[in-house]
Amino acid sequence: MTEKSIEVFQDLYLRGGSAASIRDCILSQVREPWQHDPERENDMKGFAGGDEDVIVLVRASFDDIDESGLVLWQEKDGYRVSNIVPRNVGELGIMKYNVILRDFVSLVAQPAAQGGGFEIDLTSPTQTLDDWLTADSAAALRRFSRLANKSTGASHPLDRERWFTFLITVHGTSKRLDTEQLARWLIEVEGWPAERAQELAIDYEFALVLLEQYDHSRP
């Protein structure tokens, strides 16, 4: 049976060609419902204090999505969308954030890329445990989760042993999920109580730091 996917914030990268060329192509395609915000752009450049360029665009409100500012930040090989910030509400949430991002791709980035010759890299809106962990680490976590007593976490000796196996396996790799991803996977995919999932996420973070410190302290 296919494991349930988790909805995640998408990332967008514009790569290839010079930053100046990408910038010019993007701005040449900006039209309603998008607009350029040079004032906010200059403010952000002043705060950044570096040589990286910033492009700030504003998407007018639509459906039940608030007017929002989209920030493109220069990287060595192009630009990436570093954030999308609503004007009148606290946060967009994953679904609305991704809707705005895909709207930008459709109305601005794709037409600009066709004329400018740069590439668009848009990540998936959903991910699974296998996107975040190696096969061995993912198998160890699934084994722990599916055999553990979800009301007690890793307190039973056998559950604790399987939890430690997962921690040690992850420690030996560079491919790791973060605490938010772990908690969301436990809750949304495996059905763990939120309190127990958060406890395990905290323990996971502490254990990896401790194991790394132990490695560094060895002669």
Stretch-by-stretch model annotation:
Residues 1-41, 219:
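Short, extreme N-terminal segment that most often corresponds to the first beta-strand
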Residues 17-19, 32-75:
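Amphipathic, interaction-prone secondary-structure segments
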Residues 56-181, 185-208, 212-217:
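Charged interaction segments
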